[in-house]
Amino acid sequence: MRLARKVALITGGTSGIGRATSLLFSREGAKVAVSGRNKDRGQDVVKEIIAAGGEAVFVSTDVRFPDQCRRTVEETVDAFGRIDILFNSAGVLFANTVPDCTEEEWDLTLDVNLKGAYLMSKYTIPIMAAQGGGIIIHNGSGWGLVGGAAAASYCASKGGVVLLTRAMAIDHARQGIRVNCICPGDVDTPMLIDDASKRNMPFDKYLDEAAVRPMGRIGTPDEIASATLFLASDDSSFMTGASLVVDGGGIA
């Protein structure tokens, strides 16, 4: 097991990539704190982990708020004694250009996607430093590396995540903390389906457009979880500050 005796805290762990990663990390031996806003979905993930013989707890968190992020870290340590891996996977996506983007959409996107990663890291880093190290993984995006149509607020937030990753990697390497970013392309998640709806585009057409990429399809949450596992394991022991693109060749 690649994560035996490790403790992982995963935000956005109730659906999509976060859910798949929670389940995979547990299968690889980690104790998992599943964090998210939807209690019912979170408890379902925890029950699935426990039924398979793993250990998990659900922690209700809205990553926009400092007090909730601090409490989430504290509850994880109370439950499992430490935090070895933080995966900041909570995210939102709005289809907008700058003129179309409302201030509410802009603020929500930056607050969840970027500020949430900052806050969770802020309260986790002292724990990791005190225990001699740890691993932080941010969920970025291919659209944090290149521009995307009608995704202004999302691109801005994910570009910030990529640069935050690099800055944190420099600041905390000597504390034994590695910081990397996973950058998925389009993935078959509820967020992607919702994005298609916001663009008034049938999901089948969305899939047809995705087929132009070299591999001719969108990704699955399990595929992104597997790449995230690599970043969370000793297999990536000499990697920090990296953005790992997993997108079927979309930005190649």
Pin down the residues of each PLM region:
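Active-site helix of classical SDR
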Residues: S121, S157, T165
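Alpha-helical segment proximal to the catalytic Tyr-Lys
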Residues: P126, I170-R174, S237
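Substrate-binding pocket helix/loop in short-chain dehydrogenase/reductase
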Residues: T97-V98, T102-L110, E209
